UniProtKB/Swiss-Prot annotation:
It is a single-pass membrane protein. The gene is hemG. FMN binds at residues 14-18, 90-158. GO terms for cellular component: membrane. One of its GO terms (biological process) is protoporphyrinogen IX biosynthetic process. In E.coli extracts under anerobic conditions catalyzes the 6-electron oxidation of protoporphyrinogen IX to form protoporphyrin IX, transferring electrons to fumarate reductase, presumably via menaquinone. In vitro under aerobic conditions forms protoporphyrin IX using ubiquinone as an electron acceptor. Complements an E.coli hemG deletion, allowing normal growth in vivo. Its EC number is 1.3.5.3. The keyword Ligase does not apply. This is Protoporphyrinogen IX dehydrogenase [quinone].
Amino acid sequence: MASQSPKCLMLYSTTDGHTKTIMDTIARQLADETKVRCDVVDIKDGNSYVLADYEKVLLGASIRYGHFSAAFINYVKQHHSELSAMPSAFFSVNLTARKLDKNTATTNVYTRKFLNQSSWSPQLVGVFAGALWYPRYNFFDRVLIQFIMKVTGGETDSTKEIVYTDWAAVRRFASDFAALPLAVPPRPKANTVEKPDGILRSGSGAHCLLAIVGMSAAVIVGIRIIAAKRG
């Protein structure tokens, strides 16, 4: 009797759907090239799946306004021991990674901070640029993201939809994930080269300031629109 194909659990946390698109792309490549059986699952439903039933696990999560989703953070906290005991990998998705000096685990502040604070030590980490969907955002998100993009030198045309993802990098990551050995050797905490705390706090503070200013801008614009309608 033929042996069953290896199974891979692929859990994603997405804000606007693009992280799932990336995960689906990786799953298709694995299925085509290695015949691995891939279960692509929203991490909100992750607890319905038993990690011990899989040979490998991949987690992918988007970042919005500097934060991963609560569902993603809670899942990792709950299952970090199981994740570290099996072949596991992780990728984050954020617009900051559109910049070449912000698209690795050591240079992307959000990813680096998460890994340094997490008890989980994935064997493989990727950072991918996300997508900008101005027409699909609600008013608040559109104004705030537009403001952040202006401050960071990005696209501010609210009619644009832009995918910044480097698909070649995604394919390389998929190949590296497929190559992870099934046996997990003891390993130290992943070396993400954390910068001094002051720098991290400064970076986080800057993003908080951007969020506050952006929210203020959104409120002001909303008030002006309401006032104009009443007038």
